[in-house]
Regions:
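Short, solvent-exposed loop/turn segments at the edges of secondary structure
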Residues: 1-3, 52-54, 260
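Phosphate/diphosphate-binding loops
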Residues: 4-8
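C-terminal structured "cap/appendage" subdomains that terminate the fold
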Residues: 200-203, 209-259, 263
Length: 271
């Protein structure tokens, strides 16, 4: 699918640490679904068309008491984001995410950091299928390192033209990370090494072949047994071009069909 549109948002500070975000967006999503696409995609197009339009209001709140946004050693960061498709449009939906980060100084140089994030999406009004192009994806940088990006969640393996299962994403997700950071010897404060433990998964609708031999789909209910875990080590560098992170990860409970990726890097701050 391909999404085009425009958005406008602005932030309003109302305390030293708190900020509110307000905005809106209009989007048109062109869905190219055919007989080899996941059955849920085909049913969605049959019901809502191949080019649904949505107008959504966005709202958010953040609180940031970290001592440094690039390389924090203490403090808390929270962010709540909401997106609601307005009534009367092709799709009426809502989705929310909440992120919580906490940095604990263990000594002058060692820091323990926690990051947790949850996401939830659903529909209302005349819409009864959550738009799959609004799904959450888990896996890879920013969630569970050691697995390929966006691969931890419901899959559809009914496409006989494709040996690999399609990663569908989900309308619910959880991920959490714990990092222990320390500076490299030599006093260079722009370089830090870290060890980490990640966990996460997304839940939604998975594809399967029913008793009649036809492609179908069903909800994948929340279960902690679906969670994937990984651990590893890495280097964080505040470079002249911006913050960089390099990690070497080892999946702890890889299951059949999972796609792994040991070495990963990211540009930007945060987990």
């Amino acid at each position: 699918y391909e999404t085009r549109g425009a958005s406008l948002a602005f932030g309003i500070p109302f305390t030293e640490n708190d900020r509110v975000f307000l905005g809106g967006k209009i989007e048109s999503t062109k869905v190219d679904a055919n007989s080899n696409s996941p059955q849920r995609y085909q049913d969605y197009v049959n019901r809502y068309g191949a080019d649904p339009v949505s107008v959504a209001a966005t709202v958010g709140w953040s609180r940031d008491s970290r001592d440094n946004s690039l390389a924090p050693t203490r403090g808390v960061y929270q962010r709540l984001n909401g997106e609601v498709g307005l009534p009367g449009m092709d799709i009426e939906y809502y989705k929310f995410t909440y992120q919580y980060q906490h940095y604990f100084p263990l000594s002058r140089t060692w820091t323990l950091a926690f990051n947790g994030e949850v996401g939830y999406g659903d529909v209302y009004g005349q819409t009864d299928m959550f738009p799959f192009f609004k799904n959450f994806y888990v896996g890879g940088i920013g969630s569970v390192r050691g697995f390929e990006s966006g691969t931890l969640g419901p899959k559809d393996s009914t496409n006989k033209m494709n040996d690999d299962a399609d990663n569908l994403g989900g309308d619910r997700m959880v991920n959490a990370s714990l990092e222990l950071l320390a500076p490299l010897p030599g006093g260079d404060r722009t370089l830090r090494i870290f060890g980490f433990l990640d966990a996460g998964y997304a839940w939604g609708y998975e594809g399967f072949v029913n008793a009649n031999g036809h492609a179908d789909y069903r909800r994948q209910e929340f279960s902690m047994s679906d969670m994937r875990y990984s651990t590893g080590i890495g280097v964080a560098w505040i470079s002249p071009l911006g913050p960089l992170k390099f990690s070497l990860a080892f999946p702890l409970n890889e299951k059949e069909g999972d796609k792994t990726q040991r070495f990963q890097f990211q540009i930007g701050t945060g987990f």
